[in-house]
């Protein structure tokens, strides 16, 4: 089933990661959340236990989901950043020279990973379209983002210390809408 707007999810059983936040996310989008381990998704899709799943392009191709599911919607309901985490004691223990080397190395790693990911996604999309015959859909993302607002509000209400981080993310998103 092509998903062009949240209401298209009504009545569909969609695999989500096993977390209360992801279950609530799917409920707000109008679908029926089906928490399930990733290893069971292919069989569940094949058996009709699931109507769909949310995942990236590599899961679509590398795990064979595109052999069964013929639509992939870029609705941007969830964006998962990749993070590099470092201990403050480690960072603060570096000399100025070591810190400069570390930061230069980080930029190299970041660029290399980003390029490799973009290449892998392009290859996966090519395979999905040309071998698995998957149709990629680019719906208006605003309705999906609007549907997530209550989830954002509830998470922020329960964790007010996250508000400054959330605000910075929103500012970044507003400044980089074409990214």
What is the meaning of each model-derived region?
Residues 1-179:
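N-terminal secretory/targeting leader peptides
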């Amino acid at each position: 089933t092509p998903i062009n707007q949240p209401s298209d999810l009504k009545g569909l059983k969609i695999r989500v990661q096993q977390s209360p936040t992801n279950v609530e996310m799917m409920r707000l989008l109008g679908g029926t959340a089906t928490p399930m381990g990733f290893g069971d998704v292919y069989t569940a899709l094949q058996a009709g236990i699931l109507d769909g799943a949310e995942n990236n392009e590599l899961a679509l191709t590398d795990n064979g989901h595109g052999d069964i599911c013929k639509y992939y919607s870029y609705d941007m309901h969830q964006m998962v950043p990749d993070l590099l985490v470092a201990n403050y004691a480690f960072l603060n223990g570096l000399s100025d020279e070591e810190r400069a080397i570390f930061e230069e190395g980080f930029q190299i790693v970041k660029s290399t990973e980003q390029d490799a990911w973009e290449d892998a996604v392009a290859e996966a999309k090519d395979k999905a379209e040309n071998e698995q015959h998957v149709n990629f859909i680019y719906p208006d993302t605003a309705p999906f983002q609007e549907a997530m607002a209550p989830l954002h509000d509830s998470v922020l209400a329960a964790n007010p210390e996250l508000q400054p981080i959330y605000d910075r993310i929103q500012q970044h998103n507003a400044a980089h809408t074409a990214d």
